[in-house]
Amino acid sequence: MGEILTFTVAGSPQTVSRAIEEYARGEGRVTAIVVPWESDRNTLSMAVTAVKKDGWAIEHTNLGTIRLTDAGDERTTLAIIAEPPDHPERAQLTAVFERFVRQVQSRFHVQA
């Protein structure tokens, strides 16, 4: 398991996860989807994958996990865990994940 980054944002875990999914879909290089079997009542787990398309073929490479925990008062704590892939393009994929994390941080209101 890789580096962990934690911060708190406004909104419930469900609202924030939907916003992250939509943002990732619009960005195009990564997907971020809720993984129901790794989630529970208070915490949602999201898989972040790189997407590479070649004609009809689509390759997904796991880059990391986002855990969204209800912090009360319509706030959510995000824990973002990098999981560097065992892949020939590891450095490039790590850079894609790091860029996505920075964009998520800057896009969502980070609370102290």
Question: Which residues fall in each region the model found?
Answer:
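Terminal, regulation- and interaction-focused segments at domain boundaries
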Residues: 1-36
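A short, structured loop/turn motif at beta-sheet edges
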Residues: 10-13, 37-40, 68-76
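Hydrophobic transmembrane signal anchors and adjacent membrane-proximal interface regions, especially
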Residues: 30-33, 46-48, 58, 110
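Beta-strand/loop substructures that line and gate deep hydrophobic ligand-binding cavities in soluble
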Residues: 53-112
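Glycine-rich, flexible loop segments associated with nucleotide phosphate handling
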Residues: 34, 38, 60-63
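Amphipathic, interaction-prone secondary-structure segments
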Residues: 39-59
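Short beta-strand micro-motifs in enzyme catalytic cores
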Residues: 3-5, 42-44, 76
